[in-house]
A protein has these predicted regions:
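Extended ligand-binding regions for polar small-molecule ligands
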Residues: 64-73, 133-136, 140, 146, ...
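A ligand-binding cleft/hinge motif common to bilobed small-molecule-binding domains
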Residues: 87-90, 104-112, 158-161, 186-219
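Bacterial N-terminal signal peptides that target proteins for export
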Residues: 1-11
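Periplasmic-binding protein-like
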Residues: 122-130, 202-242, 261-285
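Acidic, polar ligand-binding/catalytic clefts
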Residues: 68, 72, 77-141, 212, ...
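Extracytoplasmic small-molecule ligand-binding "clamshell" domains
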Residues: 25-103
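Short helix-initiation/N-cap motifs at beta->coil->alpha
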Residues: 64, 79-90, 134, 152-154, ...
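Ligand-binding cleft/hinge of the Venus flytrap
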Residues: 50-54, 67-76, 152-172, 199-206
Length: 288
C-alpha cells in the first residue's frame, strides 16, 4: 500500500549521503566516530519489531538489525537503548541516544522539534483491538467508547476529533492491552503490526476472545528515522542508507525474517530499483 499524497522532498536531501568526511561531520557523527559506537533508541520488547532475548536480557529484532547495518557502515559498534512513547523524544534531545529507529511515524508536531531522514523505512497505521463481543466493526463504532493508546500517540487526535472516542493514554502497549482485557478500555489502538503479532504470535491463544475491529488502518503514515535538529550530515547519511535498504531489498529481507508485514516494503523496493523513492513531508520550521 503506497501513500501517494505525501509532499515530495527535494532530491538534493540525499546528495553525498554515503560519503561524509569527518572534517564536515556534525556533532552526532563526530561523537559516534570518536567513541567508536552509535547508540540507537529502539522500541524494546515490542514484537515483531523488537524481541527480548531472555538469556541475555538484550533486545534484538527488526529495528536492531537496521541499527546494526548503520553501525557497520560507519565502522563502529552498536548499542541499543529501549525507549517508550514517553521517553524517546527526551532521550534523543538529551543525547542519550544518537538516533531513534522506533515506530515513530511522521507528524507535523514531531517535525517541529526533531529532524528526520525523509525517506521512510516503513508505512504503518493504527489498528483497534477489541473483544469479539464488542460489536465494534468500524472506526465509527468507537464513538463514545474508551480507546486506550500509548502516551504521545499520533492516533489520539483522529480517534477523538474524527471518531468521537474517549481517549485514554497509558505508558505502553502491554498496559493498554491489560486495560482492554480488564474491561477498562473498549479498544486498544496501536500500530497494526504490533497488534497483529499479539493476536497471531506465540501468545496468541490468550487473546482468542479478541480481534482487530477492521482491516482499515488509521492514518497510515511514513515511519522515519529521527535525529536531533540541525544535524544535516547525520540526516543525509541516514537517508542515503535507507534508500540503499530499499534498493537492495534489505528491508524486505529483515521484515520477512521477523514477521513484519512487508507489502509496502516490497512495493517500495520495486520503485527504488527504478530510482523512485517516497518521502515524508519536508521538515517543518523549528518552533521558537
Amino acid at each position: 500500500m503506497m501513500k501517494q499524497d505525501w509532499v515530495k522532498a527535494a532530491a538534493a536531501l540525499a546528495l553525498a549521503a554515503l560519503g561524509i568526511g569527518a572534517a564536515h561531520a556534525d556533532a552526532t557523527l563526530d561523537r559516534v566516530k570518536q567513541r567508536g559506537k552509535i547508540v540507537v533508541g529502539v522500541d524494546g520488547a515490542s514484537p515483531p519489531f523488537g524481541l527480548l532475548d531472555p538469556a541475555t536480557g538484550k533486545v534484538g529484532g527488526f529495528q536492531t538489525e537496521l541499527g546494526a547495518d548503520i553501525a557497520r557502515r560507519l565502522g563502529v559498534t552498536l548499542e541499543t537503548v529501549p525507549v517508550t512513547a514517553s521517553t524517546r523524544v527526551q532521550f534523543l534531545q538529551a543525547g542519550k541516544v544518537d538516533l531513534l529507529i522506533a515506530n515513530i511515524q511522521w507528524t507535523q508536531e514531531r517535525s517541529e522539534i526533531l529532524s528526520y531522514a525523509p525517506t521512510p523505512y516503513n508505512l504503518v497505521g493504527g489498528a483497534a483491538m477489541v473483544s469479539k463481543k464488542s460489536g465494534i466493526k468500524r472506526w465509527e463504532d468507537l464513538k463514545g467508547k474508551v480507546a486506550c493508546v500509548s502516551q504521545g500517540s499520533n492516533f489520539a487526535k483522529p480517534l477523538q476529533d474524527t471518531y468521537g472516542a474517549v481517549v485514554k493514554g497509558l505508558r505502553n502497549i502491554p498496559e493498554s492491552l491489560l486495560a482492554l482485557k480488564g474491561g477498562s478500555c473498549d479498544a486498544s489502538v496501536h500500530i497494526q503490526p504490533a497488534l497483529y503479532e499479539t493476536l497471531n504470535g506465540p501468545n496468541g491463544r490468550e487473546w482468542s476472545d479478541f480481534e482487530l475491529a477492521t482491516p482499515d488502518q488509521l492514518i497510515p503514515s511514513p515511519t522515519v528515522i529521527w535525529t536531533r535538529r540541525n544535524e544535516a550530515d547525520t540526516r543525509a547519511f541516514v537517508d542515503g542508507v535507507i534508500r540503499d535498504w530499499h534498493q537492495s531489498g534489505l528491508l524486505v529481507k529483515q521484515a520477512e525474517r521477523y514477521g513484519v508485514p512487508a507489502d509496502y516494503l516490497k512495493q517500495a523496493s520495486i520503485q527504488a530499483q527504478a530510482g523512485k523513492f517516497e518521502s515524508a513531508p519536508p521538515e517543518a520550521l523549528a518552533t521558537p
